[in-house]
Design a protein with these regions (language model features):
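Acyl-donor (CoA/ACP) binding surface of acyl/acetyltransferases
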Residues: 1-20, 24-25, 60, 64-157
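An amphipathic alpha-helix signature
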Residues: 15-22, 42, 46, 50
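Residue-level marker of structural boundaries
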Residues: 27-30, 39, 54, 93
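Conserved GNAT-fold acetyl-CoA-binding loop/helix
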Residues: 29-48
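Alpha-helix boundary/interfacial micro-motifs
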Residues: 34, 44-45, 54, 102, ...
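A short helix-loop-beta-strand connector motif used in the catalytic cores of GNAT acetyltransferases and
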Residues: 50-62
Length: 157
Protein backbone atom coordinates (compact mmCIF):
# COMPACT_ATOMS: atom_id res chain seq x y z
CA UNK A 1 0.00 0.00 0.00
CA UNK A 2 1.36 3.43 -0.93
CA UNK A 3 1.86 6.08 1.74
CA UNK A 4 -0.75 8.22 -0.02
CA UNK A 5 -3.43 5.84 1.25
CA UNK A 6 -2.10 5.89 4.78
CA UNK A 7 -2.79 8.33 7.58
CA UNK A 8 -1.34 11.82 7.08
CA UNK A 9 -1.23 13.95 10.22
CA UNK A 10 0.37 17.21 11.21
CA UNK A 11 1.86 18.69 14.34
CA UNK A 12 3.73 21.83 15.25
CA UNK A 13 7.52 21.73 15.06
CA UNK A 14 9.18 21.31 18.47
CA UNK A 15 12.78 21.80 19.66
CA UNK A 16 13.64 18.14 19.16
CA UNK A 17 12.92 18.52 15.42
CA UNK A 18 15.99 20.72 14.95
CA UNK A 19 18.28 17.99 13.57
CA UNK A 20 15.52 16.53 11.39
CA UNK A 21 14.93 19.91 9.72
CA UNK A 22 18.69 20.47 9.41
CA UNK A 23 19.10 17.18 7.54
CA UNK A 24 16.07 17.83 5.33
CA UNK A 25 17.25 21.37 4.50
CA UNK A 26 20.64 20.07 3.33
CA UNK A 27 19.23 17.28 1.17
CA UNK A 28 20.75 17.71 -2.33
CA UNK A 29 17.33 17.94 -4.03
CA UNK A 30 16.11 20.51 -1.51
CA UNK A 31 19.24 22.62 -2.09
CA UNK A 32 18.80 22.23 -5.88
CA UNK A 33 15.32 23.79 -5.78
CA UNK A 34 16.03 26.39 -3.07
CA UNK A 35 16.70 30.03 -3.86
CA UNK A 36 20.00 29.71 -2.00
CA UNK A 37 22.00 26.70 -3.20
CA UNK A 38 24.56 26.85 -0.40
CA UNK A 39 24.78 24.07 2.16
CA UNK A 40 23.56 25.32 5.54
CA UNK A 41 26.00 25.03 8.44
CA UNK A 42 24.81 23.62 11.75
CA UNK A 43 25.49 26.95 13.47
CA UNK A 44 23.47 28.86 10.85
CA UNK A 45 20.65 26.36 11.19
CA UNK A 46 20.54 26.58 14.99
CA UNK A 47 20.25 30.38 14.87
CA UNK A 48 17.59 30.22 12.14
CA UNK A 49 15.66 27.42 13.88
CA UNK A 50 15.48 29.18 17.27
CA UNK A 51 14.49 32.46 15.63
CA UNK A 52 11.64 30.84 13.68
CA UNK A 53 10.44 28.60 16.50
CA UNK A 54 10.15 31.54 18.90
CA UNK A 55 8.42 33.89 16.45
CA UNK A 56 4.64 34.22 16.87
CA UNK A 57 4.38 35.17 13.18
CA UNK A 58 5.86 31.83 12.10
CA UNK A 59 3.99 28.54 12.07
CA UNK A 60 6.10 25.46 11.30
CA UNK A 61 4.38 22.12 10.81
CA UNK A 62 5.73 18.59 10.52
CA UNK A 63 3.62 16.18 8.49
CA UNK A 64 3.76 12.50 9.33
CA UNK A 65 2.60 9.40 7.48
CA UNK A 66 1.77 6.69 10.00
CA UNK A 67 3.79 8.60 12.64
CA UNK A 68 6.90 8.87 10.42
CA UNK A 69 8.01 12.42 9.51
CA UNK A 70 7.39 12.99 5.79
CA UNK A 71 7.64 16.74 5.26
CA UNK A 72 7.46 20.26 6.63
CA UNK A 73 5.50 23.41 5.86
CA UNK A 74 6.60 26.80 7.19
CA UNK A 75 4.19 29.74 7.12
CA UNK A 76 5.45 33.25 7.86
CA UNK A 77 3.07 36.17 8.35
CA UNK A 78 4.40 39.56 7.31
CA UNK A 79 2.68 42.75 6.17
CA UNK A 80 -0.76 41.17 5.82
CA UNK A 81 0.51 38.21 3.82
CA UNK A 82 1.59 34.70 4.70
CA UNK A 83 4.52 33.24 2.77
CA UNK A 84 4.56 29.47 2.45
CA UNK A 85 7.68 27.30 2.23
CA UNK A 86 7.63 23.53 2.19
CA UNK A 87 9.70 20.44 1.60
CA UNK A 88 9.11 16.72 1.33
CA UNK A 89 11.50 14.20 2.91
CA UNK A 90 13.41 12.22 0.27
CA UNK A 91 11.75 8.91 1.17
CA UNK A 92 8.29 10.50 0.85
CA UNK A 93 8.65 12.17 -2.56
CA UNK A 94 6.61 11.06 -5.55
CA UNK A 95 3.71 9.78 -3.46
CA UNK A 96 1.27 12.66 -3.83
CA UNK A 97 1.81 13.97 -0.30
CA UNK A 98 2.74 17.57 -1.13
CA UNK A 99 -0.69 18.73 -2.29
CA UNK A 100 -2.35 17.03 0.68
CA UNK A 101 0.12 18.69 3.06
CA UNK A 102 -0.47 22.08 1.45
CA UNK A 103 -4.26 21.76 1.73
CA UNK A 104 -3.94 20.83 5.41
CA UNK A 105 -1.56 23.76 5.95
CA UNK A 106 -4.10 26.17 4.42
CA UNK A 107 -6.64 24.99 7.00
CA UNK A 108 -4.07 25.75 9.70
CA UNK A 109 -3.62 29.28 8.32
CA UNK A 110 -7.37 29.83 8.67
CA UNK A 111 -7.38 28.40 12.21
CA UNK A 112 -4.26 30.26 13.30
CA UNK A 113 -4.57 33.66 11.60
CA UNK A 114 -8.14 33.67 10.24
CA UNK A 115 -7.87 35.24 6.78
CA UNK A 116 -4.64 36.20 5.08
CA UNK A 117 -3.31 36.22 1.55
CA UNK A 118 -1.01 33.20 1.19
CA UNK A 119 1.87 33.31 -1.30
CA UNK A 120 4.28 30.62 -2.44
CA UNK A 121 7.42 31.21 -4.49
CA UNK A 122 9.03 28.55 -6.65
CA UNK A 123 11.67 28.25 -9.33
CA UNK A 124 10.29 27.93 -12.89
CA UNK A 125 11.84 24.50 -13.49
CA UNK A 126 10.45 22.94 -10.33
CA UNK A 127 7.60 21.07 -12.03
CA UNK A 128 6.80 18.90 -8.99
CA UNK A 129 6.32 22.00 -6.85
CA UNK A 130 4.20 23.87 -9.39
CA UNK A 131 1.95 20.83 -9.87
CA UNK A 132 1.58 20.35 -6.11
CA UNK A 133 0.76 24.02 -5.55
CA UNK A 134 -1.83 24.02 -8.33
CA UNK A 135 -3.40 20.78 -7.09
CA UNK A 136 -3.67 22.32 -3.61
CA UNK A 137 -5.57 25.35 -4.93
CA UNK A 138 -2.79 27.85 -5.66
CA UNK A 139 -2.91 29.92 -8.84
CA UNK A 140 0.06 31.37 -10.69
CA UNK A 141 -0.15 35.13 -10.22
CA UNK A 142 3.22 36.48 -11.31
CA UNK A 143 6.48 35.57 -13.00
CA UNK A 144 9.45 37.60 -11.80
CA UNK A 145 11.99 37.33 -14.61
CA UNK A 146 14.53 39.52 -12.80
CA UNK A 147 14.70 37.20 -9.80
CA UNK A 148 13.74 34.07 -11.76
CA UNK A 149 10.82 32.79 -9.71
CA UNK A 150 7.10 32.16 -9.96
CA UNK A 151 4.60 33.55 -7.46
CA UNK A 152 1.51 31.54 -6.54
CA UNK A 153 -1.52 32.79 -4.57
CA UNK A 154 -3.80 30.49 -2.65
CA UNK A 155 -7.13 30.75 -4.49
CA UNK A 156 -9.52 30.02 -1.59
CA UNK A 157 -9.42 33.54 -0.11
Amino acid sequence: MDDINNHLSLRKVIYTDESLLFNWANDPDVRKWSFSKNIISLDEHKIWFNKKLNNSNVLMLIFEVNNTPAGMVRLEKENGEVVLNYLIASQSRGKGLASRMLKMAMNEVKNHWQSFKVLAYTLPGNIASTKSLEKAGFLLSETDTRKNFLVYNFADQ
